[in-house]
């Protein structure tokens, strides 16, 4: 696994994920199916690198799906965009186990900061959008929070958004 502090991607073949940390758990399988479909459609249209912020919720689910699809999708890669070292230190044990497994198997891990700071999530979201040509979102329309910021930033930059909500 490559570990770098900053990198630039071939934006033309990269997609990023954004989504809410919390969602209706009874909808988990429906969300998983929609994410899988969006990832496969992006892959069929030339997207091979998928960037996840590895936050609890949609980010980890999307990363798990990418990892599960890699054996049947040659050239598909998973990039972890980690806002700061120690991001998962406060995760619940089950989420931490998923996070650690995905970190170990990610094709590239980018840690944007060694330390926690106030705007770390927004900086991570901006990094992902600026390095992607597609945003796959699970966005419910609320006009606040990181998912809103990322969705809005992609729209301002003219980056296509596939909203699976």
Outline where the language-model segments fall:
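Acidic/glycine-enriched connector segments
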Residues: 2-165
């Amino acid at each position: 696994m490559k570990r770098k502090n900053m990198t630039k991607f071939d934006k033309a073949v990269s997609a990023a994920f954004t989504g809410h940390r919390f969602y209706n758990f009874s909808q988990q399988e429906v969300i998983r199916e929609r994410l899988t479909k969006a990832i496969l459609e992006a892959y069929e249209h030339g997207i091979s690198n998928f960037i996840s912020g590895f936050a609890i919720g949609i980010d980890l689910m999307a990363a798990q799906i990418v990892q599960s699809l890699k054996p049947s999708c040659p050239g598909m890669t998973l990039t972890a965009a980690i806002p700061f070292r120690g991001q998962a230190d406060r995760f619940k044990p089950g989420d931490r186990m998923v996070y650690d497994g995905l970190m170990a198997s990610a094709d590239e891990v980018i840690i944007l900061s060694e330390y926690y700071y106030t705007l770390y999530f927004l900086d991570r979201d901006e990094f992902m959008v600026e390095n992607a040509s597609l945003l796959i979102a699970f966005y419910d329309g609320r006009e606040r929070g990181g998912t809103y910021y990322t969705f809005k930033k992609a729209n301002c930059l003219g980056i296509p958004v596939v909203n699976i909500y």
